[in-house]
């Protein structure tokens, strides 16, 4: 991670940390770095989620891109994976998504995609950061006919949906799907997609007003969907986040099915039909111990990466794997798209239910989940935790007490000013005790409370 770029682009409080002035500068510099080698008039696609600040930042970003001579196509409200897909198949020089994903409405972010639909390399981000910190703007300033132009391509979302439908073998008639769109980017896309696939649909979290994105709904609040599934007597619930790049599911009994379980279910099915490359699933260090055991017990392997879907994708690309993801619900199918995709994951999951004739509860029951607790501690310097001797000492103390029957992971968040404390243990009681013991020391040492 650099000065401006985190694990998922540039983020901050909109109009305070992430200002329109900065967005203009980022558009200008990002546009230059990503299109300077273009032989024709460069083209960049821009999408956004439903946050009130999206239009403000989009306007500034577009102005910056136009000032460097880029042809801009605005996609309107669309999911992050939708932007990645369209960037690739429309032969654009770059794509940009304006979103802070699952973060609160006050936050926003800007993430770039290269012409191949993948997120930027570290080298590209570093080049942009160097120019952002330059004392003087020496980039080209085209005039007249060489200035950029802007157009709208709002039908891009429908093009993306048509593509997704081609990735499944079954129609979903007879399956009642409850959708929670987090009042975000999938609010329209999800309903159209599942209706086209003949599912019976009930929806919540699909009335965005600019302020309600992720507010008690979506993949970070699946308990609301769990109640909704029971109320509507649905067969499955699918909760997306604000920008639609992650999915958390709920079974017909209202029980939450997380990203680890979803990865296992899909991995097992793909392996059975001969479509799981190298019989391997790529996950992160945050995956539950039960995931690793279930993968191994079913004749598959797992590879661990650092937390962040970009690291999962890097490992998948480097070693030719086609399935990976995170417990948080970022699931990547490299056969179909270049980034985590909630809608794609959702239809693959329902497709497996239809193909096997099994309920989601039956599919999920094949993986035992070990008790796990995650506590987020808000701090000013999240990286200082890695060098704190008292934090290191309490981690060692807890690990010794668990005697190999559990694990501890303490790390700085890649996108927020948080230290994440995760503990897995043999029992819920031990898990709770150990995670609070470590979190208390982190709070005391960092000098802040949640």
From Swiss-Prot:
Q: What is its EC number?
A: 5.4.2.10
The job of this chain, per UniProt, is described as:
Catalyzes the conversion of glucosamine-6-phosphate to glucosamine-1-phosphate.
Phosphoserine PTM positions read 101
Species, as recorded: Lysinibacillus sphaericus (strain C3-41)
As cofactor, the record names: Mg(2+)
Q: Which UniProt keywords apply?
A: Isomerase, Magnesium, Metal-binding, Phosphoprotein
Reaction it catalyzes? alpha-D-glucosamine 1-phosphate = D-glucosamine 6-phosphate
Binding site residues for Mg(2+): 101, 241, 243, 245
Which GO terms of the cellular component aspect does the record hold? cytosol
SUPFAM superfamilies recorded? Phosphoglucomutase, C-terminal domain (SSF55957), Phosphoglucomutase, first 3 domains (SSF53738)
**Xref: Pfam families:** PGM_PMM_I, PGM_PMM_II, PGM_PMM_III, PGM_PMM_IV
What the entry lists under InterPro entries is as follows: A-D-PHexomutase_a/b/a-I, A-D-PHexomutase_a/b/a-I/II/III, A-D-PHexomutase_a/b/a-II, A-D-PHexomutase_a/b/a-III, A-D-PHexomutase_C, A-D-PHexomutase_C_sf, A-D-PHexomutase_CS, Alpha-D-phosphohexomutase_SF
Q: Where is the active site?
A: 101
Protein name as annotated: Phosphoglucosamine mutase
Q: What is the recorded post-translational modification? A: Activated by phosphorylation.
Mind listing the GO biological process terms from this record?
carbohydrate metabolic process; peptidoglycan biosynthetic process; UDP-N-acetylglucosamine biosynthetic process
Q: Which Gene3D superfamilies match?
A: Alpha-D-Glucose-1,6-Bisphosphate, subunit A, domain 3, Alpha-D-phosphohexomutase, C-terminal domain
Cofactor stoichiometry and binding?
Answer: Binds 1 Mg(2+) ion per subunit.
The Swiss-Prot or TrEMBL record describes its family as follows: Belongs to the phosphohexose mutase family.
Q: Which domain of life is it from?
A: Bacteria
Q: What are the recorded GO MF terms, alphabetically?
A: magnesium ion binding; phosphoglucosamine mutase activity; phosphomannomutase activity
């Amino acid at each position: 991670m650099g000065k401006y770029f985190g694990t998922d682009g540039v983020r901050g409080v909109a109009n305070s940390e992430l200002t329109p002035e900065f967005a203009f500068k980022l558009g200008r510099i990002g546009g230059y770095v990503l299109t300077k080698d273009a032989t024709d008039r460069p083209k960049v696609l821009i999408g956004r989620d439903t946050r009130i600040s999206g239009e403000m930042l989009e306007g500034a970003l577009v102005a910056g891109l136009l000032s460097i001579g880029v042809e801009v196509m605005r996609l309107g409200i669309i999911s992050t994976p939708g932007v990645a897909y369209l960037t690739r198949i429309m032969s654009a020089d770059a794509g940009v998504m304006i979103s802070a994903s699952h973060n609160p409405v006050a936050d926003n972010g800007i993430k770039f995609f290269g012409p191949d639909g993948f997120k930027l390399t570290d080298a590209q981000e570093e080049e942009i950061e160097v120019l952002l910190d330059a004392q003087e703007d020496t980039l080209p300033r085209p005039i007249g006919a060489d200035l950029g132009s802007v157009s709208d391509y709002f039908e891009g979302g429908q093009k993306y949906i048509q593509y997704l439908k081609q990735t499944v073998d079954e129609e979903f008639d007879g399956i009642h799907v409850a959708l929670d769109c987090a009042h975000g980017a999938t609010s329209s896309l999800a309903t159209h997609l599942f209706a086209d696939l003949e599912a019976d649909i009930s929806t919540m979290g699909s009335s965005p007003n600019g302020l309600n994105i992720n507010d008690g709904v979506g993949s970070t609040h699946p308990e609301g969907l769990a109640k909704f599934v029971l109320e509507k007597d649905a067969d499955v619930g699918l909760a997306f986040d604000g920008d639609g790049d992650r999915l958390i599911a709920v079974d017909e009994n209202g029980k939450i099915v997380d990203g680890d379980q979803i990865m296992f279910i899909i991995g097992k099915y793909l392996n059975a039909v001969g479509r799981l490359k190298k019989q391997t699933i790529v996950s992160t260090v945050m995956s539950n111990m039960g995931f690793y055991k279930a993968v191994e017990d079913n004749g598959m392997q797992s590879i661990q990466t650092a937390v962040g879907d970009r690291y999962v994708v890097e490992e998948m690309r480097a070693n030719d794997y086609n399935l990976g993801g995170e417990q948080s619900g970022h699931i990547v199918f490299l056969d179909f798209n270049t980034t985590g995709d909630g809608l794609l994951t959702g239809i693959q999951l329902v497709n497996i239910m239809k193909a096997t004739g099994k309920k989601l509860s039956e599919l999920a029951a094949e993986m035992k989940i070990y008790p796990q607790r995650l506590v987020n501690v808000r701090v000013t310097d999240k990286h200082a935790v890695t060098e704190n001797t008292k934090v290191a000492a309490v981690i060692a103390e807890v690990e010794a007490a668990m005697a190999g029957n559990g694990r501890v992971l303490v790390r700085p968040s890649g996108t927020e000013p948080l230290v994440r404390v995760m503990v897995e243990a043999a029992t819920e009681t031990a898990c709770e005790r150990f995670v609070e013991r470590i979190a208390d020391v982190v709070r005391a040492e960092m000098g802040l409370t949640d």
